[in-house]
Structures are given as C-alpha cells and as structure tokens.
Curated annotation (Swiss-Prot):
Membrane topology category: Single-pass membrane protein
Family: Belongs to the ATPase B chain family.
Organism: Baumannia cicadellinicola subsp. Homalodisca coagulata
UniProt entry keywords in alphabetical sequence: ATP synthesis, Cell membrane, CF(0), Hydrogen ion transport, Ion transport, Membrane, Transmembrane, Transmembrane helix, Transport
Disulfide bonds: none
NCBIfam families (UniProt xref): ATP_synt_b, PRK05759.1-2, PRK05759.1-4
Name of the molecule in the record: ATP synthase subunit b
GO MF term (any one): proton-transporting ATP synthase activity, rotational mechanism
C-alpha cells in the first residue's frame, strides 16, 4: 500500500468521523454547554438580585435598629421622668404625713399639759383648803382668816 493512499484513506475516514461527530455528537454537546451557560447566567443574576435584596434588608434592619434604639431611649427617659415624679410625690406625701403626725403630737402635748395643769391646780386648791382649815382651827380672828383665804383663792 502506498503512503499517499493511506493518508488519503485516513483523511477520508477522519472527515467522515468529523462529519458524524458534527451531526450526532456536537449538537448534544453544544446544547448541554448552552444549557450550562444559561444556568450559570441565571445563577449569576439570582446572586446579584439576592445581593441587592440582602443590602436592602441590611439597610432596613439598620433603620429598624435605629428606631428601636430611639424608642428604647424614649422609654428610658419616660421611666426616669416617672421615677422622679414618684419620688417627688412620695416626698410630698411623707411631708404631709409628717406634718399630720407633728400636729397630732402637738395637740396631744397640749392636751396633756392642760390635764397636768388642771391636776396641779386641783392639788393646789386642796392644799389651800387644807391649810385654810388648819388656820381656821387654830385661829381666833375669823375676819382676818377670811381675807387671807379670799386673797389666796383670787390668786389661784
């Protein structure tokens, strides 16, 4: 066999092989590659939209956190105001109670003082009466004694 004929036969066989591959093998491979390219493109678009959605979600979360922090600060400030108001009310109530207790104590002291004064006055009167009786028993001049008794009673 001649080398030229062999090369020519191999070239024909190769051409037939390439034609068969182009007709039966190449189209499914191309369609698989195109499908894969389309899937990759779709995945890239999905990733980009997901990134955008994630950025929007992050921004919304940040705004939401800022709003929550502001609300928390407002709540804390309101609680502090309420605390101060309660403290002021408690102080005022304590002052009112203290004043009532002091007034009651002063009334009680005044009442006890009057009672003690009255008891002392009664004791003095009894002593005067006893001393008067003794003077009268021992005394001869009743006019003088009555003047003394009248003076003592007038002083009481």
């Amino acid at each position: 066999m001649n080398i030229n004929a062999t090369i020519l036969g191999q070239a024909i066989a190769f051409t037939l092989f390439v034609l068969c591959c182009m007709k039966y093998v190449w189209p499914p491979l191309i369609s698989i590659i195109e499908k894969r390219q389309q899937e990759i493109a779709d995945n890239i678009k999905f990733i980009e939209t997901t990134k955008k959605d994630l950025e929007k979600a992050k921004e919304e979360a940040t705004k939401h956190l800022i709003n929550i922090k502001l609300k928390a600060q407002d709540i804390i400030e309101q609680a502090n105001k309420n605390k101060l108001q309660l403290i002021i009310e408690a102080k005022n109530e304590a002052d009112i109670t203290r004043k009532k207790i002091l007034a009651q104590a002063q009334k009680q002291i005044e009442t006890e003082r009057k009672i003690a004064y009255e008891e002392l006055r009664l004791q003095v009167i009894q002593l005067v009466i006893l001393s008067t009786e003794k003077i009268l028993e021992n005394s001869i001049d009743k006019n003088l004694n009555s003047k003394i008794i009248d003076k003592i009673l007038a002083k009481i």
